[in-house]
Each structure stands twice: as C-alpha cells, then as structure tokens.
C-alpha cells in the first residue's frame, strides 16, 4: 500500500479521495484535475503519472504528492490540505488565508473526513506513520 510505503496517513488519503472525486476513478474537474485524487496535469507529469484514470498510478502519484507536502509543511494537516487544493506555491507564500472561504471550507471538510476515517482505520493508522498530524 502506497500510504504505508510513503508514511502518509491512510485516513488522509481516503479523505482526499472522498472529497476530490467521491471515489470516481476517472473523474475530471472543471479545472482539468483527473482521477481519484484529482491530479492536475502538471502535477501528474511532475510525479510521473502517465494516465490519471489508472487507479494505481493516480493513487501512487497522489500519495507521493501528499508525502512531499507533509515534508514541506511540517505535517500540518491544514497547510497540507490547502496546498493540495490550491497548490503548494500559494500556501508557501501566503500560508492559510482566512479571507478565502473556499480554501478554509475545503480544509475543514478534509479535516472532518480525516477524523472520521481515522476512527474507522485505527489499526491501519498505527502502522502507517508515527508522525503527528496537527
């Protein structure tokens, strides 16, 4: 499992998939993001994902991206979720802008889904990562 290999919370991966694509493997957003984890084309290319509708490639790329964001933002779930949603450059420059309701709402939904998933995946979580997610 990619989450275990990259030391990313299984619950976080599931929360992202739930909120991004509602588990639709070939979902395409109005902005052009594709697949379960809704990878933007440039991000997919950067991660070596050739076919974003391929479940294995999409999840592998999405989990690697989350692992990278977790390192960049020191495991702060709010910043990781915001970075996943609007891009790491914007979050690195501005942090969390509480003037942007859309980003704040997305982060809140990810956190709520994460907490719910963590309760259901307690055994998987303990083996996935020892990192603390705030």
Identify the role of each PLM range:
Residues 1-134:
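Catalytic glycan-binding domains that act on GlcNAc-containing polysaccharides
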């Amino acid at each position: 499992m990619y989450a275990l290999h990259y030391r990313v919370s299984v619950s976080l991966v599931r929360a992202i998939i739930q909120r991004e694509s509602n588990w639709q493997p070939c979902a395409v957003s109005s902005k052009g993001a594709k697949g379960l984890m809704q990878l933007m084309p440039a991000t997919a290319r950067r991660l070596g994902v050739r076919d974003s509708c391929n479940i294995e490639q999409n999840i592998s790329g999405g989990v690697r991206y989350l692992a990278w964001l977790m390192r960049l933002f020191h495991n702060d779930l709010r910043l990781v979720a915001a970075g996943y949603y609007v891009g790491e450059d914007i979050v690195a420059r501005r942090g969390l802008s509480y003037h942007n309701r859309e980003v704040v709402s997305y982060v809140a939904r990810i956190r709520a889904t994460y907490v719910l998933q963590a309760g259901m995946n307690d055994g998987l979580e303990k083996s996935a990562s020892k990192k603390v997610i705030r």
